[in-house]
Amino acid sequence: MTARNSLTIVLAAGEGTRMRSSLPKVLNPVAGRSLLAHVLSAAPHGERDRLAVVIGPDHRAVGDEAKRVRSDAAIHIQAQRLGTAHAVLAAREAIAEGADDLLIAFGDTPLISAETFARLREPLHDGSSLVVLGFRAADPTGYGRLVVQDGKLTAIREQADASADELKITLCNAGVMAIDGKIALDVLDKIGNANAKGEYYLTDAVGIVRDLGLIASVIETSEDEVRGINTKAQLAEAETVMQTRLRLAAMAAGVTLIAPETVYLAADTTFGKDVVIEPFVVIGPGVSIADGAVIHSFSHLAEAKIGSKAQVGPYARLRPGTSLGDGAKIGNFVETKAAQIDAGAKVNHLTYIGDAHIGASANIGAGTITCNYDGFDKHKTEIGAGAFIGSNSSLVAPVKIGTGAYVGSGSVITKDVPDDALAVERNVQTAKDGWAKRFRDAKSRHRKPKAH
């Protein structure tokens, strides 16, 4: 049997004024990824699946984010905000192209899963014409109740319109919906705005489907999965739920998190086998950590690639563009940026390595910095394999340190150093015999007695 195709419409036109943010609501991040990106990543994305995103007229950045995450996304603009059904019909052109299953979701529900989208479609294959996603609310106050009789959805009753018996229902409307594509436009066009706000409500689709003599049904998911994000407090709650998911998934894959609740991961973090993450580590977007690597406490990583059995920290900061080879070591109070550090190289302490390539097994002494910025442009430092950079050295880029070369401690290197050479740049040390005693004696003669 040929697989059914689908169109998912994600509504992302809301203003999000309660977020008190200059960002459109759906661009606020959870686990290093925008709310919208989480939803788009979970939505069906096979060869027979299409995606449409409805945005507000002043939110081009939302459309840009949608295209970044899903290049196949079609962007539609809701010129006026006149309700959820009106928002869906902003994508009328996409609906008119036809689909077996029409899915409707919201861009501010980052915890929804691909599995839930798949389950939402199943009743459409078994005779239902409309499926609503529901959840059992710990406190249903304010939610629309899902009225079910004989296993079929008969109504979505808003709090103000619910009877005393209906108010006892804890099964609530999550807003996410699937409609048989053959009737979708007909149903949506029948939704009116004869209500106090004069808006077109998607929930009215249930009554229209039943009036057509068709079946509406419900599937359930957890309350956490359908949390809508409208405030910064709710954003923090979603972050907590997402971090728990990510930590559990990492440990299930063989990662050792010594104190899981203190480790923060990004949605796209990838791990090899036998990775160890010590307490109080923050991993931002774009990080991959290979087999056997250890990330020590109080380290921060973003857009970095960590090789097998490499070590990072404690108190290290790996900024975007950092790549550690197998067995490389980044120690305490080291910062790297746009740095390729090859296998076995060591940068053990108190060092800044930026816009640099460090060859295999090179050793970078404490206090070394690559002086990569001249106030206008960034410049690169090349350090050859097996090179030894003495402590407290400044390497003024652009500069190359040859394979096996040595740089004496305290040097300021401004010229290339040949392979196997020693480069030393410092003033000649002098010692003045008796100077310290003469200095102390002079100070003692001129010092006033302290008052008691």
UniProtKB/Swiss-Prot annotation:
Entry binding sites for Mg(2+): 108, 230
Principal location class: cytoplasm
Cellular component, GO, one term: membrane
Any one Gene Ontology molecular-function term assigned to this protein's record: glucosamine-1-phosphate N-acetyltransferase activity
Linker: annotated segments: 233-253
Record text on subunit structure and interactions: Homotrimer.
Catalysed reactions, as listed in the record: alpha-D-glucosamine 1-phosphate + acetyl-CoA = N-acetyl-alpha-D-glucosamine 1-phosphate + CoA + H(+); N-acetyl-alpha-D-glucosamine 1-phosphate + UTP + H(+) = UDP-N-acetyl-alpha-D-glucosamine + diphosphate
Listed SUPFAM superfamilies: Nucleotide-diphospho-sugar transferases, Trimeric LpxA-like enzymes
Cofactor: Mg(2+)
InterPro entries tied to this protein: Bifunctional_GlmU, GlmU-like, GlmU_C_LbH, Hexapep, Hexapep_transf_CS, MobA-like_NTP_Trfase, Nucleotide-diphossugar_trans, Trimer_LpxA-like_sf
Organism superkingdom: Bacteria
EC number: 2.7.7.23, 2.3.1.157
Pathway: Nucleotide-sugar biosynthesis; UDP-N-acetyl-alpha-D-glucosamine biosynthesis; N-acetyl-alpha-D-glucosamine 1-phosphate from alpha-D-glucosamine 6-phosphate (route II): step 2/2; Nucleotide-sugar biosynthesis; UDP-N-acetyl-alpha-D-glucosamine biosynthesis; UDP-N-acetyl-alpha-D-glucosamine from N-acetyl-alpha-D-glucosamine 1-phosphate: step 1/1; Bacterial outer membrane biogenesis; LPS lipid A biosynthesis
Region (Pyrophosphorylase): 1-232
Family to which this protein belongs: In the N-terminal section; belongs to the N-acetylglucosamine-1-phosphate uridyltransferase family. In the C-terminal section; belongs to the transferase hexapeptide repeat family.
Record's keyword annotation contains Metal-binding: yes
Cellular compartment(s): Cytoplasm
Keywords (A to Z) from UniProt: Acyltransferase, Cell shape, Cell wall biogenesis/degradation, Cytoplasm, Magnesium, Metal-binding, Multifunctional enzyme, Nucleotidyltransferase, Peptidoglycan synthesis, Repeat, Transferase
Designated name of the protein: Bifunctional protein GlmU
Active site: 349
